[in-house]
């Protein structure tokens, strides 16, 4: 079994990478991917803490979070397709200019 600090360190690194991906990239699809990485890293933290405490609650929460992330992803991709058909771009800055 891996130590708690190593598991939480990996989740923090994944969360930071997702946040960095959301901040740096201006493409709506990459922002969505960064958000998904952040959600899954938070869910992984549930599993790590649950394994450390010897409880199955972390794995149950992980399944719940993955289910919610899948539904959120499906809705976001539908909005992304609609946005691309309307604006012909996925660049967030260009979309902000069109709205103004």
From Swiss-Prot:
Listed GO CC annotations: NADH dehydrogenase complex; plasma membrane
Chain segments annotated as transmembrane? 4-24, 28-48, 60-80
Pfam families given in the database record: Oxidored_q2 (PF00420)
Which Gene3D superfamilies does this entry report, sorted A to Z? 1.10.287.3510
Record field: catalytic activity? a quinone + NADH + 5 H(+)(in) = a quinol + NAD(+) + 4 H(+)(out)
Keywords assigned? Cell inner membrane, Cell membrane, Membrane, NAD, Quinone, Translocase, Transmembrane, Transmembrane helix, Transport, Ubiquinone
Location comes to:
Cell inner membrane
Main subcellular location of this protein, as a coarse class: membrane
Q: Which family does it belong to?
A: Belongs to the complex I subunit 4L family.
Name by which UniProt lists this protein: NADH-quinone oxidoreductase subunit K
Q: Taxonomy-wise, where does this protein's organism fall, top ranks first? A: Bacteria, Pseudomonadati, Pseudomonadota, Gammaproteobacteria, Enterobacterales
């Amino acid at each position: 079994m891996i130590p708690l600090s190593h598991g939480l360190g990996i989740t923090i690194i994944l969360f930071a990478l997702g946040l960095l991906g959301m901040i740096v990239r201006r493409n709506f699809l990459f922002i969505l991917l960064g958000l998904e990485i952040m959600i899954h890293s938070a869910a992984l933290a549930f599993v790590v803490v649950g394994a450390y405490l010897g409880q199955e609650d972390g794995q149950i929460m992980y399944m719940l979070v993955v289910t919610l992330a899948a539904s959120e992803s499906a809705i976001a991709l539908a909005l992304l397709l609609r946005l691309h058909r309307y604006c012909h771009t996925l660049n967030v800055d260009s979309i902000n200019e069109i709205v103004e």
